[in-house]
């Protein structure tokens, strides 16, 4: 299956609830590469790439997030592959 790269902004109660760490763990489970970070406006930004079915699985997961999160919006767009290796939480 082809690799794709996706970029998302996740809104709602997504900071201070373990969202970034949980996203990294889910991405690792799905064998995806990329990064996640908090934004000053309260959203979380995520860029990830991997096999299309796995990448789409993370997109679906972002719509729910971890247990204590309350996701109200997810904006996702496809972008060119970035050649990212590993998945990290950016500060």
Curated annotation (Swiss-Prot):
The active site is at residues 20, 38. Residues 5-91 form the Acylphosphatase-like domain. PROSITE patterns: ACYLPHOSPHATASE_1, ACYLPHOSPHATASE_2, ACYLPHOSPHATASE_3. It catalyses: an acyl phosphate + H2O = a carboxylate + phosphate + H(+). One of its GO terms (molecular function) is acylphosphatase activity. Gene3D superfamilies: 3.30.70.100. It is an enzyme of class 3 (hydrolase). Keywords: Hydrolase. Its EC number is 3.6.1.7. Pfam families: Acylphosphatase. PANTHER family: ACYLPHOSPHATASE. Belongs to the acylphosphatase family. NCBIfam families: PRK14442.1. This is Acylphosphatase. The gene is acyP.
């Amino acid at each position: 299956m082809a690799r794709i790269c996706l970029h998302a902004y996740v809104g709602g109660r997504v900071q201070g609830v373990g969202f970034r760490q949980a996203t990294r763990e889910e991405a690792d489970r799905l064998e995806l590469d990329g990064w996640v970070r908090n934004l000053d406006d309260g959203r979380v930004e995520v860029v990830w790439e991997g096999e299309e079915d796995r990448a789409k699985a993370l997109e679906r997961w972002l719509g729910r997030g971890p247990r204590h999160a309350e996701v109200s919006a997810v904006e996702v767009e496809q972008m060119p592959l970035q050649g990212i290796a590993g998945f990290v939480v950016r500060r």
